[in-house]
Structure formats: C-alpha cells, structure tokens
Design a protein with these regions (language model features):
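Short, solvent-exposed loop/beta-turn-alpha elements that line the ligand-binding surface or hinge
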Residues: 2-11, 46-59, 68-79, 112-130, ...
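Bilobed periplasmic-binding protein-like "clamshell/Venus-flytrap" ligand-binding domains
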Residues: 137-155, 198-201, 241-277
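Structural recognition of the beta-strand scaffold that forms the well-ordered cores
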Residues: 14-17, 35-39, 56-58, 65-68, ...
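Append "and occasionally in soluble cytosolic enzymes with long acidic Gly/Pro-rich linkers
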Residues: 50, 57, 77-167, 226-229, ...
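Ligand-site clamp/hinge motif
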Residues: 1-47, 166, 175-177
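Short, hydrophobic alpha-helical packing/hinge segments within bilobed ligand-binding/sensory domains
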Residues: 24-26, 34, 44-45, 81-82, ...
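Periplasmic binding protein-like
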Residues: 36-39, 161, 166-215, 249-250
Length: 298
C-alpha cells in the first residue's frame, strides 16, 4: 500500500553502526562514509562545527538529567538533608559547565519551560549557609558523606553534571563520591540506588513524566517518592483540558515536588545532530526520532 504520509524522496536508507564512541561517528561523517549521524554529543559538538561542508542542527527539548535522592534510604530519608543538597546546588552554573549553556536551567520539579502547562514559580536561590544549617538540624553538624552513581548512559555530560554538584555541595559540607559505572550496569540499579543521576528523555507534556516518575508506587519511581497530596493534585492537573487552567494547577504540583526536595535537576538540555550540507530537510527531533519523509539529497 502507498505510504500514508505522501511522497518521499529517498530510495534507500542505510544505517552503519560506528559503535558507542561519538568520535567514530564524527570521523565517518568527515570522511564521507556517512551522510548524517544519529546524535552529536557535547564533547564532539565543536569538532563537528569545524568540519567543512557539515551542518549542525539543534533541538530545544525537555531531555534532562535528574540527580535524584531515594527518600527511603538514609540520609535522604531526612527531608532536611535533601533540602540542603538542593540549596547547595547552582543549577545555572551546572548548565554552563556541564552542557556549554546549551539548554535551560532546571527548577527541581522536572517540568520544562517548553511544556505547554509549565507554570513559572519564584526563582530558586542558592544559599550555602542555609544548606549548612539544614544539615546541622538533620543531625549532621560536621557534614555528611554520600555516593552518587552515574552511568553516562547518554553521554559524559552526566558525569560532568554530578562533578559540578559535587563541587557545589562541598561548600555546604556535603562530600559526594562519584561512582562511575558502565551504562549497562547502571541500568541494573538505576531505580534501586540511594543517589544517582538518571537521564530522562523528552516528553511533550509535563504531566506525562510526573506520572511516570513521581506518582506513588509507579514502576519508574526511582526516588521512592510517596505523597498522596502530590498524587491528588497531579490527578487534578491531568483532568484539566484547558491549558491556561492546567497551568494554574501545575503551579501547585510543581511547588509540592520542589518543596519536598526529591531531586537536583540542574538543566533541560538541547540535543544535536549533524549532516552533510547536501542533505536537505534533516533536522534534530526532541526525542531523537528519525523522520526521513521530507529528507532529500541535493
């Protein structure tokens, strides 16, 4: 049967596996072995931009790295410890250093500015002195030591992001040991470890990821967060069709999650790809889907 999407221009599409190393894909693009690549990471972005005849494209997304704390594991079962971690983080600095500023600053509630129901809350303020005071109130006047797992499952920016948090948190007396794991090994423990960075993909609605990741008892609730009030307010948001009214309700939802300090979520990141300049109509998709229905070769 004819393709439902109308006329297409390519006769054939071939995928070549260059392995997990982004530099191998860049080399294949530069040499002409391939016409385009699947993804372009931050470490290879500048290289691609300098290759003659190569065009880099970018998509603004809700993809993000969530440095979440499991609320059922010590010391994160103490809300004040979680609040201290959040208060010590400089999310804007994290975006700048870990992702070249390519994205938007996160607000620790996993809803992005590009989501239609996003509600703007008062800006977060870093307060190292307050973070220290919270630790003392939680029973850690001399600071606390924790280990954060990272698998670099979507690139080394994950490790860089945790490194920035480590340096921020040290000022407040929080000593973070970074446990870098193979990506396959990370996915074996991602929803079990007390403290980890997990890369979450883009979803078109903010309510979607909140239901997947923070609703009580759902399989992907890696933080172990369990708050009936949050669940009820999220139910209300999901029941509202009018976007303007849903924004008002989402302000309540976002604030609950932010106040409970479940995560440090430094930024939402832009994603990139690259292609030869004779490849027309090839664009980066927020979820990295390949859509070749309007791609053609000049």
């Amino acid at each position: 049967e004819p393709y439902w999407g109308g006329e297409v221009y390519l006769d054939e599409i071939r995928y070549i596996d260059t392995g997990e190393d982004d530099s191998a894909a860049i080399a294949a693009l530069a040499s002409g072995q391939v016409d385009a690549i699947y993804r372009l990471g931050i470490p290879t972005l500048e290289i691609a931009e300098r290759i003659p005849g190569v065009v880099v494209s970018q998509a603004v997304t809700a993809q993000t790295g969530v440095i979440r704390m499991n609320v059922n594991n010590a010391p994160f079962d103490n809300k004040k410890v979680r609040q201290a971690m959040v208060m010590a983080s400089d999310n804007a600095q994290n975006l700048k250093l870990a992702h070249r500023g390519m994205g938007s600053v996160g607000e620790n509630h996993h809803v992005a500015e590009i989501h239609p129901e996003y509600a703007k809350l008062p800006p977060l303020k870093r307060d190292v002195a307050k973070a220290k005071a919270l630790l003392a109130e939680a029973g850690f006047p001399d600071g606390v030591q924790v280990t954060c797992n990272v698998g670099n499952t979507d690139g080394t920016w994950e490790q860089d992001s945790v490194q920035v948090l480590k340096e921020n948190a040290a000022e407040a007396g929080i000593d973070i040991t970074i446990n870098v794991m193979p990506s396959a090994q990370y996915w074996e423990v991602w929803n079990k470890a007390p403290f980890s960075l997990t890369s979450w993909t883009h979803r078109p609605l903010g309510t979607m990821v909140l239901s997947l990741a923070y609703r009580s008892g759902v399989p992907w609730n890696e933080s172990g967060y369990n708050n009936p009030e949050f669940d009820a307010e999220l139910d209300k948001a999901e029941s509202i069709l009018d976007v303007t009214k849903r924004k008002e309700q989402m302000a309540v939802v976002e604030k609950i999650l932010q106040d409970d300090a479940v995560m440090v979520q430094p930024f939402f990141r832009s994603v990139f790809t690259a292609a030869k300049d004779n490849v027309k109509g090839y664009q980066t998709h927020p979820t990295r889907y390949h859509q070749f229905n309007s791609v053609w070769l000049a």
